[in-house]
Amino acid sequence: YYDLEELMTTWIEKSCTILIDESFLDFCDKPSAIKYLETYDKLYILKSMTKFYSSAGIRVGTIVSTKENIQKLKRFEPMWKLSQFDSNYLQAALDDKLFKNISKAINIKNKIELENILKNSTLVEEIFESSANYLLVKLANLNAKECQEKLKPYKIMVRDCSNFDYLDDRFVRIAVKSSSANETLKKALQEIC
């Protein structure tokens, strides 16, 4: 997590147009950048509902900015933005506070479990701190493509991060999933090593 105050100060001083993606913000208890809209009008905040609510098939999200900025963006929006299903889903998801609390607790438990599995694997050199529902991992003695191939028979997918800035082919991103998915990964790593 970056120091948002520090970044915003720098960006505002340079009069940058700022787009902040808060799609993973629900996984942690960090503040939104929305408060900066009161004093800075070149800010856009994007939020996808598919991340926290595990609804990849439903393309629902929001963009928050000043009234003027939203009016400018409206000329580019599609005629049919949301289906009735999407709209109902969005409303139900936002109203369900219990889901949010339970999901956070389950994600934390499963992430700790996943971290412990990875720490005990000789394939892993380093695990980086994450507030989201995935872990960035540096592999010890194989590259991302080799790791993907070794995990394929177990139907486990990891994200090759070699095309991310400052990362090479030894970095993968592993999603935090269920406890049973963690057990499958643990078994796979034990058999691969």
Regions found by a protein language model. Give the residues of each.
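Active-site pre-lysine segment of PLP-dependent enzymes
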Residues: 1-18, 22-52
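A general structural detector for well-ordered alpha-helical segments in enzyme core domains, enriched
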Residues: 3-7, 33, 114, 147, ...
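PLP-dependent aminotransferase class I/II
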Residues: 42-120, 125-127
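Short acidic/glycine-enriched loop/turn segments that link adjacent beta-strands
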Residues: 57, 131-133, 166-168
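Conserved PLP-binding catalytic core of the aspartate aminotransferase-like
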Residues: 108, 121-154, 176
